[in-house]
């Protein structure tokens, strides 16, 4: 049980931990100043807690989120919601972004300006070709990512953090930003929430279930116990690297001009690497960032292809994997900025819906809930999420004004109280539904 859980946990941590997870903690460390400890506590509590809880809820029943959403809300909604989620977080956003991030941070600085355009094409051809070859055999990713690549990038990050702590430890942190001075834990909590990692948890729960089935279990008790081991491994690995990277950012001296943009994480990683490793710094950074991004790319291709193959089996897994790899490659080279412009609002809409679904599933594990009440809850959260994005991102003023009067709107959580009210109503409305108890196949 412990071995199966540890292996699966390392695999999931490897595909979870991407470029954004490298950059956010050093930024928080620099911006939180003397309030680092409560800030990183809030960040870990939400960023790790929400993601791991969403992952566990999605794997407790081997039928996954598609079954939970279909039975509690509606089959058509489950297919629509998950299709949009997988496409948004996969080939149309995160997959190409991981490739371009690996190139821009790790490879581009090694090239002359004249060769950077050609360099991107060559790099992404090799990058996506390697990811595609691994993704063609999903049953092998436990060995190739969980046993090999995850330890590689984790060790590289640990080396950077340890050497950074030795070199910069004891340095007085810079003054905290106004937000962290006002509420360090609260600001850290919101930064963790805004990583959107719960969306990846939904996507990667498919890989978790398939990997656990592949390992085999003698009983439902062993399966469930292993899932909790998986959650603990992922949580500990994330927390350790988040705290280490955050401490590096907190101790590293960042000039004022690098702080102005509000996200000094990339500057800290590149400059700290340069000062610690000297002439080999860029090679170290290239290896660390590329491997970190690559594992996420493989995970996204596999999970997206597996989902669509399960929902629409007329097309083979290989065709889906090929299509999503080619789409990611094309966008990485032709139009990433435009795609990100439209993908991020979609992800921001999906996020509160995802959290609301997880809340419903958790409560329904303990008490019966009304199906109309659950449907109403998700409908209200969806409307608020869409109105919030249209109001803030697309400047629809009357919608922005409507959303702003809701509780916690300033904290980017206008949907939270309506979701809680909807769940409470589900306790008293008719047509109550017990949580399904699964049996091992």
Where are the language model's segments positioned?
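Hydrophobic, membrane-embedded alpha-helices of multi-pass small-molecule transporters
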Residues: 9-17, 163-169, 179-245, 284-293, ...
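Selective recognition of specific alpha-helical transmembrane segments in multi-pass small-molecule
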Residues: 49, 53, 152-164, 227-253, ...
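Membrane-water interface regions at transmembrane-helix termini and the short interhelical loops
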Residues: 60-64, 68, 126-149, 214-217, ...
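TM-loop-TM module centered on a large, flexible mid-protein loop between adjacent transmembrane helices
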Residues: 65-71, 241-294, 345
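Hydrophobic alpha-helical segments and their helix-loop junctions in multi-pass secondary transporters
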Residues: 91, 95, 154-180, 198-199, ...
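Membrane-interface loop-to-helix entry segments
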Residues: 135-164, 343-355, 374-382
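Hydrophobic, small-residue-rich membrane helices and short re-entrant helix-turn-helix hairpins
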Residues: 137-148, 185, 208-237, 255-267, ...
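A generic transmembrane alpha-helix motif of multi-pass inner-membrane proteins
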Residues: 167, 370, 374-441
């Amino acid at each position: 049980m412990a071995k199966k859980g540890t292996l699966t946990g390392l695999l999931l941590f490897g595909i979870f931990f991407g470029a954004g997870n490298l950059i956010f903690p050093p930024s928080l460390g620099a911006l939180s100043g003397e309030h680092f400890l409560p800030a990183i506590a809030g960040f870990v509590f939400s960023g790790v807690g929400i993601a791991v809880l969403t992952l566990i809820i999605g794997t407790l029943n081997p039928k996954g989120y598609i079954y939970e959403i279909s039975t509690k809300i509606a089959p058509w909604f489950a297919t629509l919601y998950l299709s949009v989620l997988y496409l948004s977080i996969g080939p149309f956003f995160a997959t190409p972004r991981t490739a371009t991030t690996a190139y821009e941070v790790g490879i581009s600085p090694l090239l002359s300006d004249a060769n950077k355009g050609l360099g991107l094409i060559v790099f992404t051809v090799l990058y996506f070709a390697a990811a595609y070859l691994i993704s063609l055999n999903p049953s092998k990713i436990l060995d190739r990512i969980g046993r090999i690549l995850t330890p590689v990038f984790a060790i590289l990050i640990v080396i950077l953090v340890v050497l950074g702590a030795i070199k910069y430890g004891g340095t007085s942190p810079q003054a905290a930003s106004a937000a962290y001075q006002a509420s360090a834990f609260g600001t850290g909590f919101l930064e963790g929430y805004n990583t959107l990692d719960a969306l990846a948890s939904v996507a990667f729960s498919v890989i978790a279930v398939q990997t656990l089935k592949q390992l085999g279990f003698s009983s439902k008790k062993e399966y469930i116990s292993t899932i909790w081991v998986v959650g603990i491994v992922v949580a500990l690995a994330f927390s350790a690297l988040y705290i280490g990277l955050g401490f590096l950012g907190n101790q590293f001296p960042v000039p004022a001009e690098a702080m102005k943009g509000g996200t000094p994480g990339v500057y800290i990683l590149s400059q700290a690497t340069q000062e610690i490793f000297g002439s080999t710094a860029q090679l170290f950074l290239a290896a660390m960032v590329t491997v970190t991004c690559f594992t996420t790319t493989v995970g996204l291709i596999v999970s997206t292809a597996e989902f669509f193959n399960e929902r629409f089996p007329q097309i083979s897994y290989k065709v889906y994997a090929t299509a999503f790899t080619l789409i990611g490659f094309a966008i990485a080279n032709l139009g990433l900025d435009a795609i990100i412009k439209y993908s991020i609002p979609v992800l921001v809409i999906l996020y509160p819906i995802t959290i609301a679904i997880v809340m419903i599933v958790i409560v329904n594990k303990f008490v019966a809930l009304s199906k109309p009440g659950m449907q109403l809850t998700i409908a209200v959260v969806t409307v608020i999420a869409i109105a919030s994005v249209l109001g803030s991102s697309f400047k629809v003023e009357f919608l922005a004004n409507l959303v702003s009067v809701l509780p916690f709107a300033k904290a980017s959580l206008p949907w939270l109280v309506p979701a809680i009210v909807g769940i409470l109503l589900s306790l008293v409305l008719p047509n109550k539904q017990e949580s399904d108890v699964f049996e091992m196949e």
